[in-house]
A protein has these predicted regions:
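Alpha-helical membrane-targeting segments
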Residues: 55-59, 116-158
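A donor-sugar binding/catalytic signature common to diverse glycosyltransferases
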Residues: 1-2, 82-85, 282-331
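A short, Lys/Arg-enriched amphipathic alpha-helix followed by its capping loop at the start of a domain
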Residues: 3-12, 25, 250-255
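Conserved nucleotide-sugar donor-interacting segment of glycosyltransferase catalytic cores
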Residues: 64-133, 184-186
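Long, low-complexity segments enriched in small/aliphatic residues
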Residues: 148-199, 207
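Donor-nucleotide binding loops and adjacent catalytic segments primarily
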Residues: 181-296
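Conserved nucleotide-sugar phosphate-binding/catalytic loop shared by glycosyltransferases and other
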Residues: 15-57, 126, 131-132
Length: 358
C-alpha cells in the first residue's frame, strides 16, 4: 500500500490485487482494489509459523493459487500498462509475457540466484565454503521447479506459450528485479546476471491507525523513566509466543524495565495482565510512532520491522520464524546492531534474559 500511495502521488493510476484479509485495511486509502479469488494467505502464514501444516496441502494450495492467478490477473493486466509484483507470485512472469506487458518484480531480501549469497528463503543465511551459495541455489531451483513448473507450464500451454525449463531463471530474466531493502542492512551480489536495482525499503508512514490506541501507548511511555522493550511477531504467530511473552514480563519486572507487546494477528500475550511494567497494544500503531520511544525491539525479523527498527536507530533482537527472517537475523548480528538471533521455541528464560542484556 505504501508503494501504491507513492505511485499515485507521482500521477499513476493504480489497481491493487490483494488478499481478502487486507480489505478493511485498504479501504481508508481510497485505492481501486480487486480482491484475490483464491484461498487467503493468512491461514498459510499461520500454519507455516506453527509448523503444523503438511507439505501436500501446502503444495495443493500453491498450485491452486497459480491457476487462479492466470484466470484473474490476465484480464486485469490487459487493462493496465505495467505489472508490479512480489517475487513470491509464481505466475506473474508468464502472465506479463502473455499480455506483452513489462513486469517489475520486487523482493524484500536478495532473492536472486547467484554465487555469493545463499537463498534467503532457506534457514542457512551464512555462506558455507563447502555447501556454497551456488549449490544451495541449484537445490532451491530444483525444489521450486518441482512445486510450480508443471502447473505454470499447464497454464502456459492453455494460453499458447512455450514451456519454461527453469522457473527461477525464467522469472529473473523476464522481469526488472527491484530490491525493496536497504543496501546498508541487506547485501547484494555484484555478479547477478539479471536486470536489477536496489531502492531501499518503502516505509508506510501513512498507515491508518486508531488515535486512542496511540494515546494510550504514549501515556504508558510517559508514566515512568525506566527502559522500554517492544515485542512483536507482526503478522506471524508461534505456539511459544505466549510463553515467550510471559518470560519477557518476568524479566522486565526483575530488572525494572517496561514492556510493550504488540499482540498482532495472533493475539500474542493477550491473556497477560497489564500493569506498570506491561502495556498490551491491541490495535496497530505505525512503527515510526512507536520505536523512537523504545530502548530495544524484539521481533520476528520481517523485512519491514527490521528496517523500521534500523531507521529508529534502536538495537534489535530477532526471533526468526519463516521465509527471509533467518536472513535478517543473520544480517543484524553480522552488522553489530543486535545480538545473535533467538529461536523462540527453544529459548529458556535465562537465555532470553541474557539476550535482553545484550
Amino acid at each position: 500500500m505504501a508503494i501504491a500511495a507513492e505511485l499515485e502521488r507521482r500521477g499513476h493510476e493504480v489497481t491493487i490485487n490483494l488478499p481478502q484479509i487486507f480489505e478493511e485495511t485498504v479501504k481508508p486509502y481510497g485505492f481501486k482494489y480487486v480482491l484475490q479469488q483464491f484461498d487467503d494467505i493468512g491461514v498459510m502464514i499461520d500454519s507455516a509459523a506453527q509448523n503444523s501444516h503438511k507439505f501436500r496441502p501446502f503444495l495443493k494450495w500453491m498450485r491452486n493459487v497459480i491457476d487462479k492467478q492466470f484466470d484473474q490477473l490476465i484480464p486485469l493486466l490487459q487493462e493496465h500498462d505495467i505489472l508490479v509484483s512480489t517475487n513470491s507470485e509464481f505466475a506473474v512472469a508468464s502472465i506479463a509475457e502473455y499480455c506483452k506487458k513489462p513486469l517489475i518484480r520486487t523482493a524484500y531480501a536478495p532473492f536472486l540466484p547467484g554465487k555469493k549469497i545463499p537463498p534467503a528463503v532457506l534457514p542457512f543465511p551464512k555462506p558455507n565454503p563447502i555447501i556454497t551459495p551456488a549449490i544451495l541455489w541449484k537445490l532451491m531451483n530444483r525444489m521450486t521447479n518441482f512445486m510450480v513448473k508443471d502447473t505454470i507450464n499447464k497454464n502456459r500451454a492453455k494460453y499458447g506459450l512455450a514451456p519454461i525449463r527453469n522457473f527461477g531463471y525464467h522469472a529473473g530474466e523476464r522481469s526488472y528485479n527491484y530490491l525493496l531493502f536497504s543496501q546498508h542492512l541487506g547485501n547484494i551480489d555484484p555478479d547477478w546476471t539479471f536486470k536489477w536495482s536496489i531502492g531501499g525499503y518503502c516505509f508506510n508512514d501513512t498507515f491508518q491507525y486508531d488515535e486512542k490506541a496511540y494515546e494510550e501507548m504514549i501515556s504508558f511511555v510517559d508514566s515512568a523513566q525506566s527502559p522500554i522493550i517492544f515485542f512483536t511477531l507482526g503478522s506471524c504467530s508461534s505456539k511459544d509466543g505466549n510463553r515467550f511473552s510471559k518470560a519477557l514480563v518476568d524479566i522486565c519486572k526483575k530488572h525494572d524495565y517496561r514492556l510493550i507487546i504488540d499482540s498482532g494477528w495472533a493475539k500474542t500475550g493477550i491473556t497477560l495482565q497489564a500493569d506498570k511494567h506491561l502495556f498490551l497494544m491491541k490495535q496497530p500503531v505505525p512503527h515510526n510512532l512507536i520505536f523512537p520511544h523504545c530502548d530495544g525491539v524484539i521481533h520476528h525479523g520481517g523485512c519491514g520491522t527490521t528496517h523500521s527498527v534500523g531507521r529508529a536507530g534502536k538495537p534489535q533482537l530477532i526471533t526468526p520464524l519463516i521465509i527471509d527472517q533467518p536472513y535478517w537475523s543473520y544480517r543484524i548480528h553480522q552488522l553489530g546492531v543486535g545480538p545473535e538471533g533467538l529461536k523462540i521455541a527453544k529459548a529458556s528464560e535465562q537465555e532470553i534474559e541474557r539476550k535482553v542484556g545484550d
